[in-house]
Amino acid sequence: MKILVDENMPYAEELFRRLGDVQAVPGRPIPRDALVDADALMVRSVTKVNEALLHGTSIGFVGTATAGTDHVDDTWLRQQGIGFSAAPGCNAIAVVEYVFSALMMMAERDGFQLRDKTVGIIGVGNVGSRLNARLQALGVRTLLCDPPRADRGDNEAFWPLEKLVREADVLTFHTPLNKTGAYQSLHMADDELLAALPDGRILINACRGAVVDNAALLRALEKGKKLSVVLDVWEPEPDLSLPLLARVDIGTPHIAGYTLEGKARGTTQVFEAFSQHLGQPQSVELASLLPVPEFSHLRLNGELDEGKLKRLMHLVYDVRRDDAPLRHVAGLPGEFDRLRKHYQERREWSSLCVQCDDATSAGLLQQLGFTTQLL
């Protein structure tokens, strides 16, 4: 059995070798000659999986080591009898920590306390629900918008988008990209929404680029709309708008979910799904794959305040480290993908054990996702 894996999927060769012969290939583009006689294909979001890619091949299973699936024509796969699996929630923690890093950077720059802000979360799935829980643990007021869940009668107080836009200080988008239908999210943030958004607000998009109409956002900013903007995803990618990049506060190359833990979860989830598909179910302990972080322990004396928390968060990951490289090379052919391919290793907060002498602080840090030890 021949299994193709994206060369940037960590641990993929090590794991999938248990099931067959493995060939690592670039994800954009995948060489046609490698596909012809392959039995399975494991991709990331950079690979468009559809009839044009797979027609005439022997591929019988596709796995994407990503939470989102808008790059995969799963309807066509189903019609062809091709097995398919994604990795829902694999990078949710990473995206949450990216959003926190961006908010803490802005709090430091603009002199506010995050606890004093109201955060509107649009899309309350794997990412949005975790973000909501961590913000609430910190004492931040949150407003939730999720029309599909609201229509199902889920036990949450959901807000209509048009009302949330007027009430929230921060809008952060965590929806799938639905181009049609009752829950269309394509260009959810359009000219009308941006016009309704009061000046001084923060807008964050770390889900899919086209959820925010990039042309409309650029028009609004060029006309003097006073917004702080964080974009990790763009419309289109990899050929993002340079004028828009110049006007956003934080711009990064679609790496919000790029922690080592998040990538490894994606790989292990599709590996386990494929092994199940073959009738050879195997499970993987994530911790057995991950290296010991270079910086793993820190002692915190006294009570935890927001300043100390910001320093802890940014010790593990500071979003500014990914903003500057994109601005330096944006517009150069292939550089967007190169930044992603050669992304500097990034860990999640759980990789840092904070030794505390205050039980309340230890409890809060644990709720936020840090590993803690009470002294």
Swiss-Prot record:
Binding site residues for NAD(+): D146, T175, D232, G257
SUPFAM superfamilies: Formate/glycerate dehydrogenase catalytic domain-like (SSF52283), NAD(P)-binding Rossmann-fold domains (SSF51735)
Keywords tagged on the record: Cytoplasm, NAD, Oxidoreductase, Pyridoxine biosynthesis
Pathway assigned in UniProt: Cofactor biosynthesis; pyridoxine 5'-phosphate biosynthesis; pyridoxine 5'-phosphate from D-erythrose 4-phosphate: step 2/5
Binding residues for substrate: S45, T66, Y258
PROSITE patterns in the cross-refs: D_2_HYDROXYACID_DH_1, D_2_HYDROXYACID_DH_3
Subcellular location per the Swiss-Prot or TrEMBL entry: Cytoplasm
GO cellular component, one term: cytosol
Any Pfam family hit: 2-Hacid_dh
Reaction catalyzed: 4-phospho-D-erythronate + NAD(+) = (R)-3-hydroxy-2-oxo-4-phosphooxybutanoate + NADH + H(+)
E.C. no: 1.1.1.290
Biological-process GO terms, alphabetical: 'de novo' pyridoxal 5'-phosphate biosynthetic process; pyridoxine biosynthetic process
Its job: Catalyzes the oxidation of erythronate-4-phosphate to 3-hydroxy-2-oxo-4-phosphonooxybutanoate.
HAMAP family: PdxB (MF_01825)
Family: Belongs to the D-isomer specific 2-hydroxyacid dehydrogenase family. PdxB subfamily.
Protein known as: Erythronate-4-phosphate dehydrogenase
Biological classification of the source: Bacteria, Pseudomonadati, Pseudomonadota, Gammaproteobacteria, Enterobacterales
Gene: pdxB
